[in-house]
């Protein structure tokens, strides 16, 4: 199962994580939160998580195949960068 993660160091990470979770939640098959980590289940297959620490937002993706993983990376990453007004940057998924 392909997995990846990306970290964005940013001021007020809680704000952007909450905004991302709220926005994505309207489009996801399911969304849940436990211990400060939001888990998003996508209808096409796979999950993403949104977590924060004191200085960053951490995104992870987990899917059944590489194509679905890339969709998750695109959805979570592009929206986070858009909300943070950092569209000219890219997240380094690994």
Put a short name on every predicted segment.
Residues 9-12, 32, 49-51, 78-81:
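Charged, terminal alpha-helix-loop-beta segments
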Residues 1-16:
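Terminal, regulation- and interaction-focused segments at domain boundaries
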Residues 13-25:
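Amphipathic alpha-helical segments
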Residues 60-94:
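C-terminal structural segments of small proteins and small subunits
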Residues 10-12, 44, 65:
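Non-catalytic surface loops within mature trypsin-like serine protease
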Residues 3, 35-39, 54-58:
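A generic structural signal for beta-strand entry/edge sites
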Residues 26-47:
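Ser/Thr-rich, low-complexity intrinsically disordered terminal regions
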Residues 44, 48-63:
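Beta-strand/loop substructures that line and gate deep hydrophobic ligand-binding cavities in soluble
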């Amino acid at each position: 199962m392909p997995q990846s993660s990306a970290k964005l160091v940013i001021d007020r990470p809680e704000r952007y994580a909450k905004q991302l979770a709220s926005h994505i939640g309207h489009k996801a098959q399911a969304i849940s939160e436990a211990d400060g980590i939001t888990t998003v289940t996508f209808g096409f297959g796979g999950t993403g998580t949104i977590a924060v620490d004191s200085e960053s937002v951490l995104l992870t993706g987990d899917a059944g195949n590489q194509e679905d993983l890339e969709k998750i990376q695109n959805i979570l990453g592009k929206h986070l960068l858009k909300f943070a007004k950092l569209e000219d940057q890219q997240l380094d998924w690994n």
